[in-house]
Amino acid sequence: MNQPKSAPNSPDSAQGLSYRDAGVDIDAGDALVDAIKPFARKTLRDGVLGGIGGFGALFEVPKKYKEPVLVSGTDGVGTKLKLAFTLNRHDTVGQDLVAMSVNDILVQGAEPLFFLDYFACGKLDVGTAATVVKGIAQGCELAGCALIGGETAEMPGMYPDGEYDLAGFAVGAVEKSKIIDGSKIVPGDVVLGLASSGIHSNGYSLVRKIIERAQPDLDADFDGRTLAEALMAPTHIYVKPLLALMQQLEVKGMAHITGGGLVENIPRVLREGLTAELDHRAWPLPPLFAWLQKHGGVADAEMHRVFNCGIGMVVIVSAADADAATGLLAAAGEQVWKIGTVRQSKEGEAQTVVV
């Protein structure tokens, strides 16, 4: 008996499908792993027990800790990535990714030990992804932590061509007796501000709106570089200078100035009943923030609750240690100013005020 012929468009007549046909290129993923191994290798430090490629990354807590407490943090780069796509600049966002997490765990006194990344896209461009991961590795070197693993997710239909998203995960350790939680801060303590390298990684939805309104030439000279370079400057990593400072004197509190600016981040390390009074004249407003404020018509109060306004990290020390801390940080290459003091809060007052 003759078998019925398959219809022209039936599954039986269709050519067999592959994962590549579905939009996932396994070979590209393998090529990326090979491309990034040298970058990751440069970040190796004591404690790493294996290389990239295993199911899990192994790390041994350094023996110098008697009672180690692990401190973890995770973050992304936010809509700064949209500007990176527009400018086709992918060499700085990797450092941004590392900085956002390692600076966060640093404020509790933690030494960053290792970092993992997540790179998600619709179609994997090996060159772009390798550039991003190279920046991640460079950020890890600046922070003294190992890039010990990550995930590259190619998900067709999830992201437009040429776009991707990033997430980072940092783990550090601090001696239990040396955890910094702000509990020792008292009235009279001094608030030191460490300079930011630019906008860092927060406020970019407003930045992009201002650019949309102002329509500037992003390739034009701006304070010794192009406006595009100023806008994409990577987030500063404060780890090594501040870890060194903690070895020299008592740091009572720190605040990484991210989303919410000075007025929302400093209160996170202050006990109830304390207020940090900041003097806006104590440090210069960098030209980039002045440009954003002018072209966006942004009010002073809004600037202080959206942007870092030139201060990327706050350190609180006793008045007796303020000069020494300033000198040590300056010697380590940081720009630092005494930007305020801690005092008792007035009734109904916010925990950080800018005067």
Swiss-Prot record:
Record keywords, A-Z: ATP-binding, Cytoplasm, Ligase, Nucleotide-binding, Purine biosynthesis
One CC-aspect GO term: cytosol
Reaction equations catalysed: 2-formamido-N(1)-(5-O-phospho-beta-D-ribosyl)acetamidine + ATP = 5-amino-1-(5-phospho-beta-D-ribosyl)imidazole + ADP + phosphate + H(+)
Superkingdom, natural source: Bacteria
Pfam hit, one: AIRS_C
Entries under SUPFAM superfamilies matching the protein: PurM C-terminal domain-like (SSF56042), PurM N-terminal domain-like (SSF55326)
EC identifiers of the protein: 6.3.3.1
UniProt-listed HAMAP family: AIRS
Family membership noted in the UniProt record: Belongs to the AIR synthase family.
Protein name: Phosphoribosylformylglycinamidine cyclo-ligase
The species this protein was found in: Paraburkholderia phymatum (strain DSM 17167 / CIP 108236 / LMG 21445 / STM815) (Burkholderia phymatum)
